[in-house]
Amino acid sequence: MPKMKSVKSAVKRFKVGKNKIKRGSAFRSHILTKKPAKRMRDLRTSKYVHSTNVKAVEKMLGI
């Protein structure tokens, strides 16, 4: 049986670490002038994929 192909868009969006999957924040592409500096600072940091979505992301990444 051939190996499963990973979803290339998912590979670009997620990074796999030690037992966790990191993701970037949304709401940072445009219309940034009305967003406060504190919110922009918080959006800069990377987050972890929520436990309810881990299984789906792992399937996309071929893990």
From Swiss-Prot:
<dbReference type="InterPro" id="IPR018265">
    <property type="entry name" value="Ribosomal_bL35_CS"/>
</dbReference>
<dbReference type="InterPro" id="IPR021137">
    <property type="entry name" value="Ribosomal_bL35-like"/>
</dbReference>
<protein>
    <recommendedName>
        <fullName>Large ribosomal subunit protein bL35</fullName>
    </recommendedName>
</protein>
<comment type="similarity">
    <text>Belongs to the bacterial ribosomal protein bL35 family.</text>
</comment>
<dbReference type="Pfam" id="PF01632">
    <property type="entry name" value="Ribosomal_L35p"/>
</dbReference>
<keyword id="KW-0687">Ribonucleoprotein</keyword>
<dbReference type="GO" id="GO:0006412">
    <property type="term" value="P:translation"/>
</dbReference>
<dbReference type="GO" id="GO:0003735">
    <property type="term" value="F:structural constituent of ribosome"/>
</dbReference>
<keyword id="KW-0689">Ribosomal protein</keyword>
<dbReference type="InterPro" id="IPR037229">
    <property type="entry name" value="Ribosomal_bL35_sf"/>
</dbReference>
<dbReference type="InterPro" id="IPR001706">
    <property type="entry name" value="Ribosomal_bL35"/>
</dbReference>
<dbReference type="GO" id="GO:0022625">
    <property type="term" value="C:cytosolic large ribosomal subunit"/>
</dbReference>
